[in-house]
């Protein structure tokens, strides 16, 4: 690797280091081999998770609403008892996803491994980083559509129809805009209007969650913020999008994958030059002076190691 790329990656280490709960295994990027396509909504709409309470598991201080697991998510609801709750979710792929829910709050947790058998284990904070087991259960998930987990908001990609980021996406993109046009427009806007927040990157703490509207209003963020903002804007346009967390080389990083109808999942792909897709994640691009040099690095999928899909 050239000295210039090494220097850039060293800088990005300071900007993009995020502490993520350890996984029991490594995830793999997947493509849709079922022939299924994402649902079509006319007019376009932002999907809103619901927790009607018709089917629940657990007990106070933590209830899991599984009424809509066929839509690709469950909702964790924590009592206001002053303790943080931890939900660990795993499927047959061996990846353990860990979610923390503060006292009195709720969180939407997606089934990003698709249909299948999931093991959910729940814990309550006892003291500091010590947690005691609450309950565990096996869930059988059969999705109505395999793309739903990547269209709904969740704890990591948190948005509503009233989010400024969603309103912006709808204002930037015409109703009849193609997916390629939508992806390119959102990509260009975010990378041109958001810059690295070095102070935030230097002080980010364990359990950090992006606030997409804060990123938009301040025009600053770290790698996690870039990826979450773009993911939310694309999902609000009914474009399935994965927020990926892992490593670029040996640096903790976040990037996005998008689904193009009739083409499939495009991994680490954000822009389209009219002839081919260029693998380009938004944080490297926004902070790169030598575009050709950095594209030669980030365009190689071997440089990316996936840990989690959110």
Residue ranges and their predicted role:
Residues 182-186, 219-234:
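Active-site nucleophilic cysteine motif
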Residues 2-180, 265-268, 301-310:
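N-terminal accessory/pre-domain segments preceding catalytic cores
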Residues 225-303, 307-310:
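Hydrophobic/aromatic-rich core segments of domains that either
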């Amino acid at each position: 690797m050239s000295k210039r790329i090494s220097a850039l990656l060293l800088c990005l280490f300071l900007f993009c280091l995020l502490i993520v709960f350890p996984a029991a295994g490594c995830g793999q990027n997947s493509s849709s081999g079922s022939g299924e396509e994402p649902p079509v909504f006319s007019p376009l709409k932002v999907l809103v998770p619901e927790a009607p309470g018709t089917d629940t598991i657990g007990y106070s201080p933590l209830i899991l609403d599984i009424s809509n697991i066929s839509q690709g998510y469950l909702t964790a609801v924590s009592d206001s008892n002053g303790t943080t709750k931890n939900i660990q979710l795993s499927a047959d792929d061996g990846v353990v996803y860990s979610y923390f829910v503060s006292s009195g709050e709720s969180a939407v947790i997606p089934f990003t491994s698709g249909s299948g058998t999931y093991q959910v284990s729940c814990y309550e904070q006892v003291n500091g980083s010590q947690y005691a087991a609450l309950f565990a259960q096996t869930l059988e998930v059969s999705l109505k559509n395999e793309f739903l987990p990547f269209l709904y908001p969740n704890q990591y990609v948190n948005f509503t129809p009233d989010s400024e980021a969603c309103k912006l996406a709808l204002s930037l993109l015409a109703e009849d805009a193609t997916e390629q046009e939508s992806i390119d427009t959102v990509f260009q806007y975010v990378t041109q209007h958001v810059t690295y927040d070095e102070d935030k990157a230097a002080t980010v703490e364990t359990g950090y969650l992006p606030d997409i509207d804060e990123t938009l209003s301040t025009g600053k963020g770290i790698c996690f913020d870039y990826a979450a903002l773009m993911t939310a804007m694309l999902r609000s346009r009914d474009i399935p999008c994965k927020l990926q967390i892992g490593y670029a080389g040996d640096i903790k990083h976040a990037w996005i994958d998008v689904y193009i109808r009739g083409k499939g999942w495009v991994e680490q792909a954000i822009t389209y030059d009219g002839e081919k897709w260029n693998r380009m994640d938004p944080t490297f691009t926004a902070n790169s002076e030598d575009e050709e040099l950095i594209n030669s690095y980030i365009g190689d999928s071997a440089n990316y190691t996936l840990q989690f899909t959110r």
